Curated annotation (Swiss-Prot):
It holds the Pfam family PP_kinase_C. GO terms for biological process: polyphosphate biosynthetic process. Belongs to the polyphosphate kinase 1 (PPK1) family. This is Polyphosphate kinase. The keyword Chloroplast does not apply. Its cofactor is Mg(2+). It comes from Klebsiella pneumoniae. Mg(2+) binds at residues 372, 402. An intermediate of this reaction is the autophosphorylated ppk in which a phosphate is covalently linked to a histidine residue through a N-P bond. Catalyzes the reversible transfer of the terminal phosphate of ATP to form a long-chain polyphosphate (polyP). The active site is at residue 432. Residues 427-461, 584-614 form the PLD phosphodiesterase domain.
Length: 685
C-alpha cells in the first residue's frame, strides 16, 4: 500500500476539525447565540491555520521549488484552497440563516442603510464622542509600505475617494481592540426589539464625518479587507543576544510575510490589484474574495441579549469538597492526592493554594513554569507576593509560546523587577509542561507539593477548556518534578526518571515500550488495549506503532479533537482502531494515555500531544495516576466520553465528520454527563 494511503495530511485533518466546529454552528439543538459564537470560533481557528499551518506549507513549497524538486505540497495547497472555499461558502450561508433566526427572536444586527433617523443621530453622537479619536486614515501612495504598517488579522476599510476621474485610496483600521465590535442601538417600536450594529458599519455610515473638510469628492465607497501574516518570527541573530531581546525585537518589527489576503468580493478590480501589489501577495498565498465582514472571531464574544434560552444553561463550577475538610490546602494534599477536572471543577483551588504558599511562613520555595497565563493573572500576583515575603521563587517563562510572546515578555520583566528568579527555555526547546513545586518546612523535614497538569495556569481558559490538575505530595512524583525543574535549568545534564514520561528525555522510548508490551500481551492471549485522548495525533513513528498494535489484535480506541494522521479501519493494518472526535460547548484539551497492561491498567495524564515536536523537541511531562481512586475516576470519564451519542463524530479516511449513530442506545451528551458525574463525587458526606 502506498505511503500516501496510510496517513491523512495533517493540514486537511486540521481543516476537518474546523468543519466540526462549523457543524456546531449549524446544529439547531444548540442555542442560537451559541451557534453564532461557534462561527466566531471557526473564524478564529481559520486565522490561526493560515498563520501557522498554511505559512509552513508555503515555506516548504518555496524551498522545494528553489531546489528544483517536485513538491507534493503544491498539490496539497490546491486541496486546502478547495476545502476552505467550500467551508467558507457554508459559513456565509449559516451566517445569513442565523441573522434571520435572530430577527425572529427580536435581535436585529442591522447595517448602515437600515438605520432610523433617531438611530442615525445617535450614531453620529457615538462616533464623535467614542470612536473618532481612534480613527486616522492612512493614504496609500507610491511610497506606502503596507506590509510594514498593516496589523496582522485586523480588519480595515479600503476607501475610494472619487473626484471626477481621480481616485484616492485611504485605509481605515477598525479599532475593535479599543471600541466594542457590537454596539447596541436605541430601541425602536416595538420596545422588545434589540437592534445592534457592527463597528464596521458605523465607520461606513460616518465616512463623511471622517473625510469632509479635508478632501473634495463626488463619492465615497468603502470595502473591507484583512491580511494574515506568517506567525513564525525570524530569529537569525548574533550569538550574544538574549532570547528576550530577540523576541522583543521580532515583535516590534511587523515584517513577517503575508500569507493570506481577504477582501470584500465586490471590491473594484483596480483596488484589489493595487492592494495585492502593495501587500506583495504571491502565487503561493491565499487570496480570498469574501463577504462584507471579516474578523468573525469577534463573534466569539457575541453579547448575551434576548431570552435566557438563547445561550447555554450555566453549569456552576464545582468545589472539590476534600479541601473544605482541612485548614489549608497543604494538609488536604498531604493526606491524599487530589484530581481536579476543569471546567467542571473550579480553578480557585489552584489559585488559593498558590496564594496560601505566597505568605505561609513554612513555605521555603516555589517553582512554576508559565506558558499562557490570563491577562490579569492572579498566579503572577501570587509569585510576586511570595518574593516580597522572602520566599525563593523561580518562574520559568516560555517566551516562545506562539501568540503569547509579547504577554510573556511583559510578565518576565514584571517578575524580575519584583525579585523573582526568572529563567527561560533554551532556544529551540520550548517548555510546554504544566508544573509547580512548593517546598515546605514541616518539623525536621522538607515536604514538597507538586502540580502536574494538562492545561495552562490560566483562569480564563479554565472556564472553557477541559483539563486536569493532579496535586500530590507523593515523594515518588514530587522528587521527579524537582528533577524536571533541574533539567529545565540545566537541559544538557543527564537526568533519569522512574515514574514520569518527560520529553525529550524518555517519552518516545517509553511510549514505544508500552505499545510493544500491549502487542506482546495480545500475542500471548492476555488482555490488551490502548486508549488515548489527544488534541493531535500526527507523529508517524507513533502512528506506525499503533498500526502494528492493531495488526497484532490490540484494540485501540482514540479520541482525537484535532489533527489525526492515522486512518482507522484499513484492512490488515488498522482494523482494530476506532477514532472519534467530540466538539461541544467546552474545548476538549486534556491528554490521557491508557494502557491495559494485562488488566492492571496504566493511566497517565499529560501535557503532550503525539506530535513530533511534543515528543522530541519540547519539555513535556506525563504523570501516572498512582492513587487507585483517581485512576478509576479518569477511566470512568473516558468511558462516558466514548459513550457519547450526541456530539461524537467518526474520524475516517474521507474526513466526512459523520456523527456516531445513536442506534438503540440511550442519549448521552458526554460533557453534560461528566458534569453530573463530577457533581456526584462532590456530594457532602
Amino acid at each position: 500500500m502506498g505511503q500516501e494511503k496510510l496517513y491523512i495530511e495533517k493540514e486537511l485533518s486540521w481543516l476537518a476539525f474546523n468543519e466540526r466546529v462549523l457543524q456546531e454552528a449549524a446544529d439547531k439543538s444548540n442555542p442560537l447565540i451559541e451557534r453564532m459564537r461557534f462561527l466566531g470560533i471557526y473564524s478564529n481557528n481559520l486565522d490561526e491555520f493560515y498563520k501557522v499551518r498554511f505559512a509552513e506549507l508555503k515555506r516548504r513549497i518555496i524551498i522545494s521549488e528553489e531546489q528544483g524538486l517536485n513538491s507534493h505540497s503544491r498539490h496539497l495547497l490546491g486541496k486546502i484552497q478547495s476545502r476552505v472555499l467550500k467551508a467558507d461558502q457554508e459559513f456565509d450561508g449559516l451566517y445569513n440563516e442565523l441573522l434571520l433566526e435572530m430577527a425572529r427572536n427580536q435581535i436585529f444586527l442591522i447595517n448602515e442603510r437600515q438605520l432610523s433617523v433617531n438611530q442615525q443621530n445617535w450614531l453620529r453622537h457615538y462616533f464623535k464622542h467614542y470612536l473618532r479619536q481612534h480613527i486616522t486614515p492612512i493614504l496609500i501612495n507610491r511610497e506606502t509600505d503596507l506590509v510594514q504598517f498593516l496589523k496582522d488579522d485586523y480588519t480595515y476599510l479600503a476607501v475610494e475617494i472619487i473626484r471626477g476621474e481621480s481616485i484616492r485610496y485611504p485605509l481605515l483600521e477598525i479599532p475593535s481592540d479599543k471600541v466594542p465590535r457590537f454596539v447596541n442601538l436605541p430601541p425602536e417600536t416595538p420596545r422588545r426589539r434589540k437592534p445592534m450594529i457592527l463597528l464596521d458599519n458605523i465607520l461606513r455610515y460616518c465616512l463623511d464625518d471622517i473625510f469632509k473638510g479635508f478632501f473634495d469628492y463626488d463619492a465615497l465607497n468603502a470595502y473591507s479587507m484583512k491580511m494574515t501574516r506568517d506567525a513564525e518570527y525570524d530569529l537569525v541573530h548574533e550569538m550574544e543576544a538574549s532570547l528576550m531581546e530577540l523576541m522583543s525585537s521580532s515583535l516590534k518589527q511587523p515584517d513577517a510575510e503575508p500569507v493570506r489576503f481577504v477582501y470584500q468580493r465586490d471590491m473594484p478590480d483596480a483596488m484589489v490589484e493595487m492592494l495585492r501589489d502593495k501587500l506583495t501577495i504571491s502565487r503561493y498565498d491565499s487570496i480570498v474574495p469574501g463577504g462584507r465582514y471579516h474578523n468573525f472571531k469577534d463573534f466569539i464574544g457575541f453579547p448575551n441579549v434576548g431570552k435566557a434560552n438563547l445561550v447555554n444553561k450555566p453549569l456552576p463550577r464545582l468545589r472539590h469538597l476534600w479541601f473544605d475538610k482541612f485548614r489549608n490546602g497543604f494538609d488536604a494534599i498531604r493526606e491524599r492526592d487530589v484530581l481536579l477536572y476543569y471546567p467542571y471543577h473550579t480553578f480557585e483551588h489552584v489559585l488559593e493554594l498558590l496564594r496560601q504558599a505566597s505568605f505561609d511562613p513554612s513555605v521555603l520555595a516555589i517553582k512554576i513554569n508559565i506558558y499562557r497565563v490570563a491577562k490579569d493573572s492572579r498566579i503572577i500576583d501570587a509569585m510576586i507576593h511570595a518574593a516580597h515575603n522572602a520566599k525563593k521563587v523561580t518562574v520559568v517563562v516560555e517566551l516562545q509560546a506562539r501568540f503569547d510572546e509579547e504577554a510573556n515578555i511583559h510578565w518576565a520583566r514584571r517578575l524580575t523587577e519584583a525579585g523573582v528568579h526568572v529563567i527561560f527555555s533554551a532556544p529551540g526547546l520550548k517548555i510546554h509542561a504544566k508544573l509547580f513545586l512548593i517546598s515546605r518546612k514541616e518539623g525536621d523535614d522538607v515536604v514538597r507539593y507538586a502540580h502536574i497538569g494538562t492545561g495552562n495556569f490560566n483562569e480564563k481558559t479554565s472556564l472553557i477548556y477541559t483539563d486536569y490538575s493532579l496535586l500530590t505530595a507523593d515523594a515518588r512524583i514530587t522528587n521527579e518534578v524537582r528533577r524536571v525543574f533541574n533539567f529545565i535549568e540545566n537541559p544538557y545534564r543527564p537526568v533519569s526518571f522512574d515514574y514520569l514520561l518527560v520529553s525529550p528525555q524518555n517519552s518516545r522510548r517509553l511510549l514505544y515500550d508500552m505499545i510493544d508490551k500491549e502487542i506482546a500481551n495480545a500475542q500471548k492471549g492476555l488482555s490488551s488495549g490502548i486508549t488515548l485522548k489527544l488534541n493531535n495525533l500526527v507523529d508517524k513513528g507513533l502512528v506506525d506503532r499503533l498500526y502494528a498494535a492493531s495488526s497484532s489484535g490490540v484494540p485501540v480506541n482514540l479520541l482525537i479533537r484535532g489533527m489525526c494522521s492515522l486512518i482507522p479501519e484499513l484492512e490488515g493494518i488498522s482494523d482494530n482502531i476506532r477514532v472519534i472526535s467530540i466538539v461541544d460547548r467546552y474545548l476538549e484539551h486534556d491528554r490521557i494515555y491508557i494502557f491495559d497492561n494485562a488488566g492492571d491498567k496504566q493511566v497517565y495524564l499529560s501535557s503532550a500531544d503525539w506530535m513530533t515536536r511534543n515528543i522530541d523537541y519540547r519539555i513535556e511531562v506525563a504523570a501516572p495516576l498512582l492513587d487507585p481512586r483517581l485512576k478509576q475516576q479518569i477511566l470512568d470519564i473516558i468511558e462516558i466520553l466514548f459513550s457519547d451519542t450526541v456530539k461524537a463524530r467518526y474520524i475516517d479516511k474521507e474526513l466526512s465528520n459523520r456523527y456516531v449513530p445513536r442506534g438503540n442506545r440511550r442519549k448521552v451528551r458526554s460533557q453534560l454527563a461528566i458534569y453530573d458525574y463530577i457533581k456526584s463525587l462532590e456530594q457532602p458526606d
